[in-house]
Amino acid sequence: MNEVFLTPKEIVVVGAGMVAHRFVESLISRADTPMHVTVIGDEARRPYDRVGLTGFFSGATPEDLELDPSVFDDFRVRFMADDRVLRIDRSARTVTTRSRKSIPYDTLVLATGSYAAKVAVDGADLPGCFVYRTLEDVHSLKEFVSARSRMLGRPLRGAVIGGGLLGLEAAGALQGMDVEATVVQYSDRLMSAQLDSAGGGMLKRLLEARGISVRTQSVSYTH
């Protein structure tokens, strides 16, 4: 009987977050499908649980937050950390990375996720202003709060711009470091993409009962 050897399909995944991890996990569960999967992430670590970032402030390690590492131990998967796709050539079906690697693909998956946008106001790049998205972000925030509070000899005050899930997580993290936290939200309620007015109002009262100030329908500026 003649054996048929199928050419492995080349799959490139741009992004190494939770969605990319789940996608690759699903792919490699199909043991009968020949494939090579290349995952390109711009952080110098494997995918981790961003929703659990606040745990870092209470003693969780990067390893505690890491998603199932066995996904990237599969022989069909190549993980490229600390790199970034700079160019996609759809005609040649290749991607070019910051490290000047050209990687061919049969299927290209963009799983870059969201990004933490800095507020477009003067002073947003000054020391003490942070975004809250990566382990490096929260590590820098923790070090700054510790050093600054020692220097001043008192607890700090902090503002969180954005009342979504990560913003509220950030406010909780600040409070856990004895920072007087205020959440500033542009819309009329917290988590406006998930909650109606009643739910947003209830959440606001719960946070205020915990000592976190909330300002809705507010704009941001620095001085």
Locate each region found by the language model.
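A conserved beta-strand/loop element that lines the FAD pocket in flavoprotein oxidoreductases
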Residues: 76-84, 89, 211-218
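Glycine-rich dinucleotide-binding loop and its adjacent helix/turn
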Residues: 112-177
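Core beta-strand elements of the Rossmann-like FAD/NAD(P) dinucleotide-binding domain
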Residues: 101-107
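Redox-cofactor binding/interface segments in oxidoreductases and associated redox assembly factors
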Residues: 97, 110-111
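Beta1-alpha1 glycine-rich phosphate/pyrophosphate-binding loop at the start
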Residues: 2-78, 171-194, 198
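Conserved small/polar residues in nucleotide/adenosyl-binding loops
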Residues: 221-223
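Rossmann-like dinucleotide-binding cores of NAD(P)H-dependent redox enzymes
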Residues: 155-159, 166-218
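A structured beta-alpha segment of the ubiquitous adenosine-cofactor-binding alpha/beta core
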Residues: 85, 97-101
